[in-house]
């Protein structure tokens, strides 16, 4: 809108009436290239207010109109069934065939894009889609963006090779990464991927848990030694710690005297195959443990202890699914405890709040808070069979419909109708660092349609798609969540399992179901076979020969 490059942090100037009229990103203390110093900017703004106030008023009006235009997506009724295929081909064409991920630098994980490509492979059988996903995961999991000592992924890579990260660790990135890696592992059974899920979720519980059960937001990039200082190594440090074993470790993790980042070494395994022999991996595990213990003596980066509903929703979903897929009760318990924490301390008169910090919950929830927590509730239902999670999801959908829906143009606003101090209410389906709330709502509404049999949820999902059909038709990769959800709505797959959830045969059926890495698939497990409404997926079904039974349904 202002004709300058985006970035962060955002610096905006507002009128006394709180209307934005000009802004930028970072302004240095001294002029740098074509960027003025911050004091020069302040001086210019002061001059405008004193001598050219009309220009500020004109700019504010123009910016307001531009924001309103951006907040009004092109409307085109729905998406034809064949659109998913053409969209997936377009996304595949912009993937990096050498290093994986979207082309160029900096490189972000872009998990919704990877999920869409995986979905395209499961639908079409074209191996190019699968290969694009596995290539990206291999490079991310072996690159410097991954913390090879402590587990967990950094925010993004500053280069196209996934080597040098921006060292900040975000809860939402790690939740999304473990979700896609778990999905791919269900198909490939690659032990390397299992290791990365295990290390990352163990890191999440170890370093991101807050008292009571929720998860903190981030771990900063900066530590007292500067950005990344906590994570990088000089060769002589490793030689001192590992002694005669250092040569083997240095080859495995790309360590050299000159370093690969500002004279020091970011550990990575990009030059080696994912896993060596079991004996060699055991040796490396011992070496990593020694370095991890030594690193713990350094002053660590600061943790942002805020508990955010939306990011916790993503973490809960990943932990719940991975806990079931890998049979890890600790992860499953962590998912349930975090969900209970949100419901216990972050609800006010039945409505979600966005943030909890230092014992206080505050700030009105956004669409993303509800969408991700509904997704979390449904993930917990799928993995536990506890129907109270479905009830909670339905309650939250009702709140969204009452306070967030755009009754004129369809879809959901990012903020509720009773929020204050906003110059406009935005409504978008674009993914950013996290999936789009509207795209996620299509997915969860489609899931609710499958698990309840109530067509009203399918209709609501279709209405959201109708609201953003024109945007999706432009082919932006940032609409991956919405387009993936459209395919789920048009090709729903529901596996209904009847039997004792703790019984050996039922567990075997659940395990076989999770071996099918189908993004469109919803799994429901029922022990209670009491009468249900005619449209309910359990209606008319019973165990065959008194044995646990699975029904595959296409609603």
Language model features by range: what are they?
Residues 1-318, 322-325, 353, 465-555:
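Replace the tail clause
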Residues 193, 331, 361-364:
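Catalytic nucleophile-loop/oxyanion-hole region of alpha/beta-hydrolase
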Residues 319, 334-336, 376-377:
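Glycine-rich phosphate/oxyanion-binding loops and their immediately adjacent helices
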């Amino acid at each position: 809108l202002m004709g300058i490059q985006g970035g962060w942090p955002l610096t905006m100037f507002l009128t006394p009436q709180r209307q934005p009229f000009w802004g930028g990103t970072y302004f240095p203390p001294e002029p740098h290239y074509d960027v003025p110093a911050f004091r020069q900017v302040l001086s210019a703004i002061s001059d405008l207010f004193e001598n050219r106030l009309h220009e500020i008023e004109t700019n504010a009006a123009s910016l307001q109109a531009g924001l309103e235009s951006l907040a009004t997506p092109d409307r085109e009724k729905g998406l034809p069934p064949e659109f998913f295929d053409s969209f997936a081909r377009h996304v595949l064409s912009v993937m990096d065939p050498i290093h994986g991920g979207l082309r160029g630098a900096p490189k972000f994980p872009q998990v919704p894009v990877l999920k869409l490509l995986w979905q395209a492979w499961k639908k079409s059988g074209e191996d190019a889609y699968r290969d694009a996903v596995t290539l990206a995961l291999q490079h991310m999991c072996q690159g410097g963006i991954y913390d090879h000592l402590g587990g967990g992924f950094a925010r993004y890579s500053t280069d196209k090779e996934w080597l040098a990260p921006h060292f900040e660790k975000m809860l939402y990135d790690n939740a999304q990464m473990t979700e896609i890696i778990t999905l791919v592992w269900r198909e490939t059974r690659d032990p390397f991927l299992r290791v990365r899920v295990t290390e990352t979720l163990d890191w999440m519980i170890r370093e991101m848990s807050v008292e009571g059960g929720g998860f903190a937001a981030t771990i900063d990039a900066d530590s007292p030694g500067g950005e990344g200082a906590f994570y990088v190594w000089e060769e002589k440090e490793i030689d001192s710690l590992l002694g005669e074993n250092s040569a083997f470790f240095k080859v495995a993790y790309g360590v050299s005297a000159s370093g690969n980042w500002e004279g020091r070494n970011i550990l990575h395994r990009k030059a080696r195959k994912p896993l060596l022999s079991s004996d060699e991996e055991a040796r490396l595990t011992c070496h990593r443990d020694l370095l991890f213990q030594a690193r713990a003596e350094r002053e660590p980066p600061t943790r942002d202890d805020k508990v955010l509903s939306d990011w916790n929703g993503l973490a809960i979903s990943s932990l719940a699914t991975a806990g079931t897929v890998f049979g890890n009760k600790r992860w499953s318990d962590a998912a349930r405890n975090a969900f209970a924490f949100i419901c216990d301390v972050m609800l006010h008169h039945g409505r979600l709040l966005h943030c909890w910090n230092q014992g206080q919950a505050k700030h009105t929830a956004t669409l993303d808070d509800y969408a991700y927590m509904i997704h979390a509730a449904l993930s917990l239902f799928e993995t536990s069979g506890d129907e109270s999670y479905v009830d909670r999801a339905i309650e939250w959908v009702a709140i969204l419909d009452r306070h967030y829906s755009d009754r004129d143009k369809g879809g959901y606003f990012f903020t509720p109708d009773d929020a204050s101090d906003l110059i406009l209410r935005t409504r978008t389906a674009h993914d950013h660092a996290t999936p789009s709330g509207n795209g996620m709502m299509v997915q969860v509404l489609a899931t609710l349609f499958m698990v309840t049999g109530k067509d009203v949820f399918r209709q609501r999902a279709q209405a959201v798609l109708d609201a953003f059909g024109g945007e999706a038709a432009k082919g932006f990769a940032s609409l991956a969540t919405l387009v993936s959800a459209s395919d789920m709505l048009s090709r729903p797959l529901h596996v209904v399992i009847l039997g004792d959830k703790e019984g050996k045969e039922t567990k075997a059926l659940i395990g076989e179901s999770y071996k099918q890495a189908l993004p469109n698939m919803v799994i429901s497990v029922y022990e209670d076979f009491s009468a249900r409404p005619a449209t309910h997926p359990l209606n008319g079904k019973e165990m065959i020969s008194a044995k646990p039974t699975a029904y595959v349904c296409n609603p």
